[in-house]
Amino acid sequence: MILRIPSLLYLFTLLTAVYAVKFDLTSDRNPKPKCIWNFASAHSLVIVTANVPGEPDQQVDIQILDGSERGNVYLSKKDVRGEARLAVTTHESADVGVCLTNRYTGSGNPRVVRSVELDVDIGADAIDYNAIANQESLSILEVEMRKLEAVTKEIVEEMGYLQRREMRMRDTNESTNQRVKVFSVLIICCTIGLGVWQLLHLRSFFKRKYLID
C-alpha cells in the first residue's frame, strides 16, 4: 500500500505534538514556580519560546530542568521581558520542565497577575526543516519523510524509556515483596521463640512453687 502526500501530512500531524500554552502568572514576594512538563528523549533539542509582557515591579524568571534522578538544571534566566527564545539539549531521557516564577519587587500589593505565552518545541518539532530543505535541495515529500523519520525515532525512544522505567518499577516491587516476606518470617520466628520462652519460664515458675512436678 502506497501512502500519498496528503496521507503522509495527516499522519505527521497526528504524530507531532504542539506544546503551546498561555496562562496567568501571579506575582508574589516569595513565588512558587509554575512548571510545564513534557517528555524528551536523551540528546534532544528543546527550544522554549516565552512571551512575557513587561510590567513594573515584576520579575519573571525561567528555569529549564528535568525530572531525572540527577535533577539536571539546563538553564536559568532572570528577569525575562518581551519574547525570549531559549535552547537546550537534554542529557538523558526524562520529563523536561519549564518553570516560571513571578517575583514582586514593589512595595504595594504583591498579588498582580501577568499573562505569559509559552511554546515548547522538542526533538523533531525544534528542527528547522526549511533550512535543511534549502541547504540540501529537498522536495516537499523528502522533507515530510525526514520529519516522519525523526518523529518515529522519538516514539521508539520514548517507548523504550517507558519500558525501562516499567522494568525498574517491577524490580522495585519484587525487591519490596521479598523484603516483606523475609520480615514476615522473622516476625513469625520471633513470635514462636517468645512463646516458647514464656512457656519455659512459666514451667520453671510453677516448679519453684511446687504447683507441678
UniProtKB/Swiss-Prot annotation:
Keyword Calcium: no
TM spans (from-to): 182-202
Residue numbers on the Lumenal membrane side: 21-181
Subcellular location field: Endoplasmic reticulum membrane; Golgi apparatus membrane
Domain GOLD span(s) in chain numbering: 33-122
Keywords: Endoplasmic reticulum, ER-Golgi transport, Golgi apparatus, Membrane, Protein transport, Signal, Transmembrane, Transmembrane helix, Transport
Role of this protein: Constituent of COPII-coated endoplasmic reticulum-derived transport vesicles. Required for efficient transport of a subset of secretory proteins to the Golgi. Facilitates retrograde transport from the Golgi to the endoplasmic reticulum.
Family per record: Belongs to the EMP24/GP25L family.
PANTHER family according to UniProt: TRANSMEMBRANE EMP24 DOMAIN-CONTAINING PROTEIN
Name of the featured protein: Endoplasmic reticulum vesicle protein 25
UniProt source species: Cryptococcus neoformans var. neoformans serotype D (strain JEC21 / ATCC MYA-565) (Filobasidiella neoformans)
Gene behind the chain: ERV25
